[in-house]
């Protein structure tokens, strides 16, 4: 490489890394994977080392990625919040160990190995045991104050527990990661899929975008979690732990959520064995892990090892190489969702990926196909996005055949032929035809599903037939099906026809929240539907609601319903065809069961823990909700009762600590009966 080429490449790489830093840290919308990003930074660092005359000025290789965004107050960390050096190489990990042994002149150094959580880095400050501030890493010197949003995280205590033998510092910055569990991420994506909305790519991006919402009510809709494992400023200094392993014990004793497991190791071989064991177990963790963090255990030795301007020299992240595969893209099919969103899907030659056979993968949307220049016939790289959803992340241009031409996204709906539209500010392309057969099928399937009014016998196959025959054009048509028509669907169908009609008739008396959920209002899932049912008590009242019924003086009137959801509900019922569906449901005799506002359980919040003698958790939940109560996942001072069975866990301990009434099944049934 000539000097001119080196200077040009350094400038090009600096611009690329800066752009990807902006997309990842500030917008939570990365366009490349960690592996590609780390490769760019590594190439830049190597060139800057080889050509120092062209490496003047601030380099992204020496800076912490900056996550500060508009709309938040900035707060200065009392102790700099660094990022970690990382590697994908076993050799480099062993060299890290050997360097510390050499520099500290110590054999037998002890290390702690922790899961590397794929979330958003945060620093939580406690003063005299009370939570006073939560701040993002920002640029390492100062970050965004997200205290109000962090307080919506149910697992994050506002006050530290006091424990025998464990000091409680006057001031401590405790560092960790905010994340979404895999279960919660999949729940949110299921809701979006039902609504025909584009799926989120991975839990990390969604968690980062959520914690930076300006409205904490919106943050509370997604069940963020936090795990804490590090420390910043500690006052007094005498309250510092002697080792990292000891600090983990303190974090747990204070009642804070910490890593599920960590390893200790002496020597490079033991470190590598622990990393491999962690890799084998990472699918069992509640959070996404993309590597292992190796830390020198002794805190005094950490201080001796010191740090660079960006990273501690006593820690390193070993990142697991992404599980990816190369295969050929045979076709692109476009699916139409319940709300008309067109989602492109890659049809692939089957390939093994993360222990499963993958033959289909998401292409996200029209813009992503164009940006990556993905063409039918290309050899593409497929990766599990966030270890969960298969996605096409790029193309192998070296294997592109001359006949592979740029993909042209459909200008008409592939199902009904209607010209597609793209609303301003949206990446989604939609079919605007409300009568599009696929949209009708998806809406009816959703309404009749177990999650909604639960019409037994009306599965996907039956709905397909009803729509194809022209007997069902919208949800209310379900209640006007004629027996004589259904009897024409085959021989000996009298019994199944009568059972279906009985199930349809019975569904007219389903719980109100099930009807609300069945309407498919954007952003309003089952939990929101239950809140709306308790508040409005009827479909017509909900359909006629005004903004002031949801938001008053910039505050939410209904628990769990923030401004974004309120506006989505109002927009839904402002559409004449949606309002007509409600009117028609009432006309055909639907009479939803309304939560009992006069019950002793009305307005009460329950938390369930352990195994009850006779009731399943679902049965107890259904009875509470039918009586106007609410079931929550976490215990707080606002909890009315904890319903506890055998083998009750930490929720029972927390209830006792907060003096929340604890009842058994017998007492619960007495409350339910009004006794």
From Swiss-Prot:
Cofactor: Mg(2+); Mn(2+)
Top EC class for this record: ligase
Lineage summary: Bacteria, Pseudomonadati, Verrucomicrobiota, Opitutia, Opitutales
InterPro entries listed in its UniProt record: BRCT_dom (IPR001357), BRCT_dom_sf (IPR036420), DisA/LigA_HHH (IPR041663), DNA_ligase (IPR001679), DNA_ligase_AS (IPR018239), DNA_ligase_CS (IPR033136), DNAligase_adenylation (IPR013839), DNAligase_N (IPR013840)
Record's keyword annotation contains DNA repair: yes
Record's function text: DNA ligase that catalyzes the formation of phosphodiester linkages between 5'-phosphoryl and 3'-hydroxyl groups in double-stranded DNA using NAD as a coenzyme and as the energy source for the reaction. It is essential for DNA replication and repair of damaged DNA.
Alphabetic keyword roster: DNA damage, DNA repair, DNA replication, Ligase, Magnesium, Manganese, Metal-binding, NAD, Zinc
Superkingdom as given in the UniProt entry: Bacteria
Residues reported to bind Zn(2+): 413, 416, 431, 436
Residue ranges of every copy of the BRCT domain listed in the record: 596-675
Biological processes per GO annotation: DNA repair; DNA replication
Name recorded for this polypeptide: DNA ligase 1
Organism: Opitutus terrae (strain DSM 11246 / JCM 15787 / PB90-1)
EC number of this enzyme: 6.5.1.2
Keyword Nuclease: no
One GO CC annotation: cytosol
Protein family per UniProt: Belongs to the NAD-dependent DNA ligase family. LigA subfamily.
GO MF, any single term: DNA ligase (NAD+) activity
Coiled-coil region list: none
Name of the gene this protein is made from: ligA1
Active site: 116 (n6-amp-lysine intermediate)
Reaction it catalyzes: NAD(+) + (deoxyribonucleotide)n-3'-hydroxyl + 5'-phospho-(deoxyribonucleotide)m = (deoxyribonucleotide)n+m + AMP + beta-nicotinamide D-nucleotide
SMART domains tied to this protein: BRCT (SM00292), LIGANc (SM00532)
Residues binding NAD(+), per UniProt: 34-38, 83-84, 114, 137, 177, 295, 319
């Amino acid at each position: 490489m000539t000097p001119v080429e080196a200077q040009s490449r350094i400038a090009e790489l600096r611009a690329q890394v800066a752009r990807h830093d902006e997309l990842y840290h500030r917008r939570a919308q990365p366009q490349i994977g960690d592996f590609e990003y780390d490769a760019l930074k590594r190439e830049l660092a190597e060139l800057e080392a080889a050509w120092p005359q062209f490496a003047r000025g601030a380099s992204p290789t020496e800076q912490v990625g900056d996550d500060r965004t508009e709309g938040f107050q900035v707060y200065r960390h009392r102790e700099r919040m660094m990022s970690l050096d990382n590697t994908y190489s076993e050799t480099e990990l062993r060299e890290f160990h050997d360097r510390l042994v050499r520099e500290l002149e110590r054999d037998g150094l002890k290390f702690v190995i922790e899961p590397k959580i794929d979330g958003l880095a945060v620093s939580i400050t406690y003063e005299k045991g009370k939570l006073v501030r939560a701040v993002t890493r920002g640029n390492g010197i100062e970050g965004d104050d997200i205290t109000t949003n962090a307080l919506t995280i149910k697992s994050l205590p506002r006050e530290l527990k006091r424990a025998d033998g464990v000091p409680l510092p006057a001031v401590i910055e405790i560092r960790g990661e905010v994340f979404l569990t895999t279960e919660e991420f999949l729940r949110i994506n299921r809701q979006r899929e039902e609504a025909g909305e584009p799926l989120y790519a991975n839990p990390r991006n969604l968690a980062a975008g959520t914690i930076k919402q300006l409205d904490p009510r919106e943050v509370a809709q997604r069940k963020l979690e936090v795990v804490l494992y590090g420390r910043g400023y500690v006052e007094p200094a005498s309250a510092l732990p002697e080792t990292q392993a000891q600090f983990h014990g303190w974090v747990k004793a204070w009642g804070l959520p910490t890593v599920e497991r960590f390893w200790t190791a002496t020597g490079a071989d033991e470190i590598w064995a622990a990393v491999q064991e962690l890799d084998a177990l990472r699918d069992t963790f509640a959070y996404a892990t993309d590597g292992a963090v190796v830390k020198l255990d002794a805190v005094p030795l950490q201080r001796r090892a010191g740090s660079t301007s960006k990273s501690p020299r006593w820690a390193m992240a070993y990142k697991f190489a992404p599980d990816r595969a190369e295969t050929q893209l045979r076709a692109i099919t476009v699916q139409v969702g319940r709300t008309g969103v067109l989602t492109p899907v890659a049809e692939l030659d089957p390939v093994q990926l993360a222990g499963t056979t993958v033959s289909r993968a998401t292409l996200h949307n029209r813009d992503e196909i164009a940006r990556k220049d993905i063409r039918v016939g290309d050899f593409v790289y497929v990766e599990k996005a966030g270890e969960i959803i298969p996605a096409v992340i790029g193309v192998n241009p070296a294997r592109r055949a001359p006949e592979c031409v740029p993909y042209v996204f459909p200008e008409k709906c592939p199902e009904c032929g209607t010209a597609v539209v793209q609303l301003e500010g949206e990446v989604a392309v939609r079919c605007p035809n409300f009568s599009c057969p696929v949209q009708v099928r998806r809406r009816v399937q959703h309404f009749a599903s177990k999650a909604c009014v639960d019409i037994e016998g009306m599965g996907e196959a039956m709905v397909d037939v009803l729509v194809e025959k022209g007997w069902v054009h919208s949800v209310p048509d379900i209640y006007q099906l004629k027996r004589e028509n259904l009897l024409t669907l085959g021989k000996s169908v009298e019994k199944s026809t009568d059972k279906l009609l009985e199930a349809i008739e019975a569904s007219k008396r389903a719980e109100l929240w099930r009807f609300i959920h069945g309407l498919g209002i954007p952003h309003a899932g089952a939990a929101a539907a239950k809140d709306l049912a308790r508040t409005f008590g009827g479909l017509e009242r909900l359909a006629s609601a005004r903004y002031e019924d949801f938001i008053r003086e910039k505050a939410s009137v209904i628990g769990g319903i923030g401004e974004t959801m309120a506006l989505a509900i109002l927009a839904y019922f402002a559409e004449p065809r949606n309002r007509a569906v409600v009117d028609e449901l009432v006309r055909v005799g639907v009479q939803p069961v309304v939560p009992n506002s006069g019950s002793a359980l009305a307005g009460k919040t329950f938390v369930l823990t352990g195994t009850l003698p006779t009731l399943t958790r679902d049965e107890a939940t259904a009875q509470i909700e039918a009586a106007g109560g609410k079931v929550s996942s976490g215990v707080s001072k606002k909890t009315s009762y904890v319903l506890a069975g055998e083998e009750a866990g930490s929720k029972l301990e927390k209830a006792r600590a907060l003096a929340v009434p604890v009842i058994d099944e017998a007492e619960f049934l007495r409350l339910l009966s009004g006794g």
